[in-house]
Amino acid sequence: MSPGLEVADLGTILSIWAHPDDETFLAGGVMSMARDRGQRVVCVSATAGEHGTDDPVTWPPERLGAVRRDESAAAMRVLGVEEHRWLGFEDGTLAGVDRSVGVARVTELLDEVAPDTVLTFAADGMTFHPDHMTIHTWVREACAGARLLCAAVEAGFLERQRDVLEAWGVYMSEERPAGVPTGELALHLVLDDPVLDRKLAALQAMPSQVEPSLAVLTPDQFRTVNRQESFVSV
């Protein structure tokens, strides 16, 4: 399962992301496995993802933000995560927030939760989304003492799924993430079917975000691209 760490090694987990659904796509399996073991998991969303639509007339920010909060609550129930915090920043604006403000909010969470492990984005934000990349900056600056694990893509998986990921349209830049060799990953999970099924059920609890993906990918492709969760130690 893992060349280094196992989920049991992670202790109390603070999982910090930009938008509701980031955590489920990138760490839903880790979080649900930890909860199954009785570990404390606190999930944090910096924004409500209220601008995450190509149709703002049908989905104005107030409406979409409320829907995404409700969807996120449903997804957290599926994963067994009972503690979910919202930082209340506006979606799409994190890069313009004074860095000291963002770092201070993360520091408050670290002081409150006292996690053994923090999960978040790597510097590339996985998709080069500016909000994702900003969260990495805040968390890395604030994080001291706890183990910091940043979401990555295993090199072999990236090579096999490159065309699918391009078709999915997840990248927000001409840049692409570099695959990480398995032996360099701190935590590498290939989710077994029960865990993957739970993760997919959590994703399906967020139809405002997942239905566009399922319009592009086949069910088998969507299942495959969500089976692995990988992290590097920073």
Where are these regions (language model features)?
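Metal-dependent de-N-acetylase/amidase catalytic core
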Residues: 1-14, 92, 96-234
